[in-house]
């Protein structure tokens, strides 16, 4: 058996997230459907670095699967991309040892969130950025960002629907990039809770709008209560950008 690692990019707009759900189109479902065709009807389960929600995109999702087929890496790449729909692309294939695990071996993840600063919607970017029509005080956002960096209990910044009991995570970097008419929030951490990046972005936008004080972030973290943080930003501005492994 070979263990195959794939890096996957997808446009999340027409998926109900990554993970298989009955009666809904998902990324995992499409990948496993393609693998089933290649394995002559045999079901092949894939493991992913993590789930993404409905409408969330990925540039660097990572999956693995085990297979009895002996194909070269380039052959896997070509075969899968031939079988997959246009909104999913395998960008890299690597053969790994059985010690590699797409989920349990993750060392750090990078997410990016795109905000379009415009009162007018952009018809060509509407599915890929969060259009934000209100003026923002960028310096206030920059002042708030360092409070999130480090190891914290992020209960205030995750959905109540999370199934994780341990809400402690470490954020290594948050970078705010001003690029033409967009703000791009770049997050690097050892892991992120359900909706955590989107709630942090929504909170930072509330800071930029003057609804929250930048110096209120430590208090919101300490309260460990979702109701004190800002609104959650929508899914279509979020990208799983890159996943790094310790092996």
Swiss-Prot record:
One of its GO terms (biological process) is tRNA pseudouridine synthesis. Keywords: Isomerase, tRNA processing. SUPFAM superfamilies: Pseudouridine synthase. The keyword Disulfide bond does not apply. It comes from the Bacteria. It catalyses: uridine(38/39/40) in tRNA = pseudouridine(38/39/40) in tRNA. It is an enzyme of class 5 (isomerase). Substrate binds at residue 111. Its EC number is 5.4.99.12. Belongs to the tRNA pseudouridine synthase TruA family. Formation of pseudouridine at positions 38, 39 and 40 in the anticodon stem and loop of transfer RNAs. This is tRNA pseudouridine synthase A 1. It comes from Bacillus cereus (strain ATCC 10987 / NRS 248).
